[in-house]
Amino acid sequence: MQEAQVRVAIAGANGRMGRQLIQAALAMDGVALGAALVREGSTLLGADAGELAGTGATGVTLKSNLEAVKDDFDVLIDFTRPEGTLAYLAFCRAHNKGMVIGTTGFDDAGKAAIHETATAIPVVFAANFSVGVNVMLKLLEKAAQVMGDYTDIEIIEAHHRHKVDAPSGTALAMGEAIAGALNKDLKSCAVYAREGYTGERVPGTIGFATVRAGDIVGEHTAMFADIGERIEITHKASSRMTFANGAVRAALWLKAQKKGFFDMRDVLNLNDL
């Protein structure tokens, strides 16, 4: 393995994503696992992060205090909950650390706090870190530019039963990509629920439908439907490792940035396509 270019800390290390982020960090060239964090009072405190993730001992033990590991990492990767993420964000700003944020479910104030913090430190904030999803977002922009003015646009997403926010952050990012390509504000054209007598579909709206069931990792479809034909652009994830690998890749890229707000399209250099 190459010498480490970036040392990462993983928040929520005991969760499903946390364990896969540990695996991804240990496997990726140029990356070293510097710290792994769990909540205060966890029974896993002091356990080896690698053994927790099933990769073997690493010498990195689980801790709950960021202050204790502040000299052990350059970039914090966080896929937890909004309230925890914002606390981590304040710490990273105070100690000049980069941050990769995969947490979803932020309100407008939370998003504004992330943008404001990015004026001081480098932040990658994305609803989805999969390469395929971010290519899909670019395809949606192109499709919307050609067909968006005259088709009915619907976004359908499905996730596992444990997901707590809806629509998913990825579905909202899809809506924002489409609305942006049409010079619209998603808030003004989104329809999130239909029930009872709804009347005919309002032209120019973007509909959302949500499924929560079983162990679905993540499925997203955008439909551009006209009379006589429709286009459907779909992404299906079968493993969370695709998100973990993308997030660690983002951390490696972020180490070279001084400050600023970025998403995965910046990391993958998709904005000029």
UniProtKB/Swiss-Prot annotation:
Gene Ontology BP annotations: diaminopimelate biosynthetic process; lysine biosynthetic process via diaminopimelate
Keyword annotations of the record: Amino-acid biosynthesis, Cytoplasm, Diaminopimelate biosynthesis, Lysine biosynthesis, NAD, NADP, Oxidoreductase
Reaction(s) catalysed (UniProt annotation): (S)-2,3,4,5-tetrahydrodipicolinate + NAD(+) + H2O = (2S,4S)-4-hydroxy-2,3,4,5-tetrahydrodipicolinate + NADH + H(+); (S)-2,3,4,5-tetrahydrodipicolinate + NADP(+) + H2O = (2S,4S)-4-hydroxy-2,3,4,5-tetrahydrodipicolinate + NADPH + H(+)
Amino acids binding NAD(+): 12-17, 102-104, 126-129
Protein name listed in UniProt: 4-hydroxy-tetrahydrodipicolinate reductase
Pathway field: Amino-acid biosynthesis; L-lysine biosynthesis via DAP pathway; (S)-tetrahydrodipicolinate from L-aspartate: step 4/4
HAMAP family assigned to the protein according to its UniProt record, in alphabetical order: DapB
Gene: dapB
PANTHER family the record matches: 4-HYDROXY-TETRAHYDRODIPICOLINATE REDUCTASE 1, CHLOROPLASTIC-RELATED (PTHR20836:SF0), DIHYDRODIPICOLINATE REDUCTASE (PTHR20836)
EC number per UniProt: 1.17.1.8
